C-alpha cells in the first residue's frame, strides 16, 4: 500500500534551539533524518527538512549518513533519486507567513513536526523550564495556521 504518490513532498519541521549555548538540539534532528530516510525507502517520498538556519549544516552532514543526497532547491529534489531537501525557515515572525505560503504552494502530501517549537497564545516560545526562547526559534509554527 502506498501513501500519496512517488516524489510527493513531505515536510519535516525540526530544530529546537537550546539555551545556554544557542545551538540546535540533536535528538529531534537525528529522528527527523531517520524519518526522512524511511519515507524515501518506503514510499518514494521527497522529504524536506524545515528548520532554523542554525540547523542546516547538521542536516546537510547527516544526509550522507542516512544515504540521501540533499539540496536546497526543491525542484532538484523532486527530480533526483534518493534525495531530500532542506529549507532554512526564518526566525522573523513578520517574514514567516510569506515563507510558509511559498512552502504550502508546493502542496506537500504531509507535514510532520519533530521537536519544533511553537508559540503560545501570546506569541511566545518557551523551553522546558519556561524560559522565553522566542528569538532563537524558527517561526515555522505558522505552517499550522
Language-model-detected regions and their locations in the chain:
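Positively charged, low-complexity intrinsically disordered leader regions
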Residues: 1-9
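A short, gly/pro- and small-residue-rich
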Residues: 118-145
Amino acid at each position: 500500500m502506498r501513501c500519496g504518490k512517488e516524489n510527493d513532498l513531505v515536510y519535516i519541521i525540526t530544530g529546537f534551539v537550546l539555551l545556554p549555548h544557542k545551538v540546535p538540539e540533536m535528538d529531534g534532528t537525528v529522528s527527523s533524518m531517520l524519518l526522512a530516510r524511511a519515507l524515501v525507502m518506503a514510499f518514494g517520498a521527497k522529504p524536506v527538512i524545515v528548520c532554523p538556519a542554525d540547523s542546516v549544516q547538521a542536516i546537510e552532514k547527516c544526509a550522507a549518513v542516512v544515504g540521501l543526497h540533499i539540496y536546497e532547491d526543491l525542484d532538484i529534489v523532486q527530480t533526483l533519486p534518493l534525495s531530500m531537501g532542506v529549507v532554512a525557515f526564518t526566525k522573523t515572525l513578520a517574514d514567516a507567513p510569506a515563507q510558509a505560503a511559498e512552502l504550502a504552494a508546493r502542496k506537500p502530501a504531509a507535514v510532520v513536526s519533530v521537536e519544533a517549537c511553537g508559540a503560545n497564545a501570546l506569541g511566545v516560545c518557551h523551553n522546558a523550564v519556561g524560559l522565553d526562547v522566542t528569538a532563537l526559534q524558527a517561526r515555522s509554527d505558522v505552517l499550522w495556521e
